[in-house]
Design a protein with these regions (language model features):
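Flexible phosphate-sensing "switch/lid" loops adjacent to ATP/NTP-binding sites
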Residues: 2-296
Length: 296
């Protein structure tokens, strides 16, 4: 059985952050890529960890890769590392964006077909007990392995935090609580509804709420409107808006191809650097995330 072991008795003294999203499509992967590439530029040994990913064939950047490597190909490129199963232990490969059933890969191996609920969401409660346990064990083992290898980890959630019941949400609740890293929540300036913020904070477990640093307002194009959105978010959540990332067109020459991923990573890093978010992350003290240890 796998149990949580507090990091006080572990040699790992890493830093890192967990990036969650208000909902699917707010740009948390773009923010994550920017953070990782900004760190990599400075020679920081960093890596992404995504407990669960859902991918489709129309995602051009990973089309030439085995399905189980597609979920973190851009984030791993940003960090200067090669995708391994422990960067993304659980992945569902859908045949297309309209079909809610796909192939489940755990530790890089196909284990059958499973349903998903909405964009990028795998509900543990919908799986048979055997598959549910295998998924959770793989996520805990993958995180433990990566935490022992890399001193700076970025844990990325999936879809929207609070969309699934806590006990069924590997990506946004179970793993982030195990990691124990500071949490930032990405919100889109185009859809920052205070009611959604209130629902989000109500749905998060007390342990996860205690880790929250604040919000990153993404896709900012109208600065007066962003000021108003930031004030609404702060009032609804009683948390600060840590940074605002400007909405800008993709870099010249980017066509979504695998060969141009590096160009996009540089672009994302520049956007994150300009927002001031990296100064805040640099100021965080060394974290002591919980580590998963195997016991009999």
């Amino acid at each position: 059985m796998l149990v949580l072991k507090k990091a006080a008795s572990s040699p790992f003294r890493g830093q890192g952050v967990t990036v969650l999203g208000m909902s699917a499509g707010v740009g948390k992967t773009a923010v994550s890529i920017g953070i990782l590439r900004s760190l990599s530029r400075r020679g920081v040994d960093c890596a992404p960890f995504k407990a669960v990913a859902v991918v489709t064939p129309d995602e051009y950047a990973g089309r030439s890769l085995p399905p189980w490597r597609r979920g973190v190909v851009q984030s791993c490129t940003a960090a200067g590392t090669v995708p391994r199963w422990w960067h993304n232990p659980v992945l569902v490969n859908l045949p297309d964006a309209r079909t809610p059933v796909g192939d489940l890969y755990v530790r890089g191996r196909r284990l059958g077909r499973v349903p998903v609920t909405g964009a990028d969401r795998l509900d543990l409660g919908s799986l048979p007990d055997r598959l549910r346990r295998r998924c959770q064990d793989a996520v805990e083992e993958g995180y433990r392995r990566l935490a022992g290898e890399v001193p700076w980890l970025l844990v990325e959630g999936a879809a929207g935090a609070g969309d699934l019941p806590p006990a069924a949400d590997l990506a946004n609740r179970i793993l982030p609580e195990l990691a124990g890293l500071p949490v930032i929540v990405v919100a889109s300036a185009r859809q920052a509804d205070p009611a959604d913020v209130s629902r989000l904070t109500d749905r998060l477990t007390p342990a996860l709420r205690a880790l929250l640093l604040g919000f990153v307002l993404n896709r900012v194009s109208d600065h007066p409107a962003a000021d108003a959105a930031a004030q609404r978010l702060a009032r609804a959540s009683r948390l600060p808006v840590l940074a605002r990332i400007t909405d800008a067109p993709p870099p010249l020459g980017y066509d979504g191809s695998p060969e141009k991923i590096d160009l996009m990573c540089e672009y994302r890093a520049s956007c994150v650097d300009e927002s001031g978010l990296m100064r805040l992350l640099d100021a965080l003290p060394a974290a002591r995330p919980g580590l998963v240890e195997a016991t009999r």
